[in-house]
């Protein structure tokens, strides 16, 4: 919350025919994290990257892996992603059945030496986080409905970032707040960073840019300006 701005490009938007080239580009850009979207075709209407991909990605880069699990029954698969090399794991609170499951997920991630995070869809009330906020390293606020890249930012998502920041100020001032969906240096970065976001996920905004390295730097600089 209001910490150093971190950029976490979404690898789902990379050129998979030139994958290692894009990884080296992210390293050259000084990206802080690599965002890995895992979708199962059930929790969200798309099917994407899985455990073997995370393991192979971990083998070719030292950039920390920010793994976002958009899957049903995440407790069943969570150990696989922890073993594969995730450095930070976000689980959707909507995919967990009750308080016991939420706490078990956080404990499992923490016990593996990995940083735990909870993710929220745009229609999930922020106050559901209150019992867990002190046990988390990060909250992921979705500013689009998860499932497909390239969507437009949902207006007012910055208000939800502010609500998370208010909880963090009371219970966990070191909490990171990540925002994913329609993030652009020209417009939405300022909105979310003014409210407390400090981790920015961008897919097409980085990989489809004429100069992806400059795009990463522009996101970081726009966030710093908004925080000033």
Annotated model-derived regions:
Residues 119-123:
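Short gly/ser/thr-rich secondary-structure transition/capping motifs
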Residues 138, 145, 153-199:
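Active-site/ligand-binding-proximal alpha/beta "capping" segment
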Residues 1-90, 95-104, 108-110, 115-116, ...:
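Conserved N-terminal beta1-alpha1 strand-loop-helix module at the mouth
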Residues 124-128:
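A short, acidic/glycine-rich surface segment
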């Amino acid at each position: 919350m209001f910490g150093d701005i971190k950029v976490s490009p979404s690898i789902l938007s990379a050129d998979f025919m030139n994958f290692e080239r894009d990884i080296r580009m992210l390293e050259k850009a000084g990206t802080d994290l690599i965002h890995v979207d895992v979708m199962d075709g059930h929790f969200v209407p798309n099917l994407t990257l899985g455990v073997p991909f995370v393991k192979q990605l971990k083998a070719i880069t030292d950039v920390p892996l920010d793994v976002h699990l958009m899957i049903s029954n995440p407790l069943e698969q969570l150990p696989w992603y922890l073993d594969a090399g995730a450095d930070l794991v976000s689980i959707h609170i909507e995919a967990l059945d009750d308080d016991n499951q939420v706490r078990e997920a956080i404990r499992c991630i923490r016990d593996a030496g990995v940083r735990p995070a909870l993710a929220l869809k745009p229609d999930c009330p922020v106050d559901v986080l209150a019992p867990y906020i002190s046990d988390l390293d990060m909250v992921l606020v979705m500013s689009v409905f998860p499932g497909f890249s390239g969507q437009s930012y949902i207006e007012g998502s910055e208000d939800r970032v502010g609500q998370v920041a208010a909880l963090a100020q009371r219970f966990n001032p070191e909490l990171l707040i990540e925002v994913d969906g329609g993030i652009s240096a020209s417009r939405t970065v300022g909105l979310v960073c003014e409210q407390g976001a400090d981790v920015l996920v961008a897919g097409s905004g980085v990989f489809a840019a004429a100069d992806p390295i400059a795009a990463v730097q522009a996101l970081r600089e726009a966030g710093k300006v908004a925080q000033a």
